[in-house]
Amino acid sequence: MANPTSRTKADIDRRRRRRRRRVQIIVIYTAIAVCLAWFFESQATTTVIFVRHAERATQPVEDPGLSEAGRQRAAELARQLVDADVVPGVGVDAIYSTSYRRSIETANPVADALNLPVLMYDVSDTEAITEAIVKEYKGKIILVVGHSNTVPEMIANMGASKNVPEISQDEYDNIYLVTIPWFGKTKTIRLRYGEPYVP
């Protein structure tokens, strides 16, 4: 006849082993879930917002700043982009501009509103800046202020639409949203802001 005490000890040991296994399984699954969450967060969709600089002044001829209409458009751009994400307190993470006054003055109201610096890029090497943005800002929102000839080129460099229509010399109201998912096809959306362009 078996000793009742030994059966109880065996049952207790078995229960402890089961409990230990359950805890180990929970810890392993939690670690896997945390790793997967980190992976998917680090691979999140990158959004690049491209705009052409706002309306430029006629003087000085060399490197004009913005006209009054351009300053109003830049202020409207800032108003729209301050809360670019639906999550409160989340918006544009970085702002890039060429070194031309009209581009910097277009970017400044957004930079001031978000307390971000305006980072300069070389207008003659659009491929380098688009590569750098994709590498450095994965899962972020970036504003890039360019020119009528560089915006379509940079959008194409991102692997997005190569069919962006030519931007007219008097056309300043386009916002191009390029979304680069960690998996899937890069998309381009064109929106309008400020006073509409009338051809």
Where are these regions (language model features)?
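Active-site-proximal alpha-helix that buttresses catalytic centers in soluble enzyme cores
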Residues: 2-39, 43-137, 150-199
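Conserved alpha/beta-hydrolase "nucleophile elbow" surrounding the catalytic nucleophile
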Residues: 147
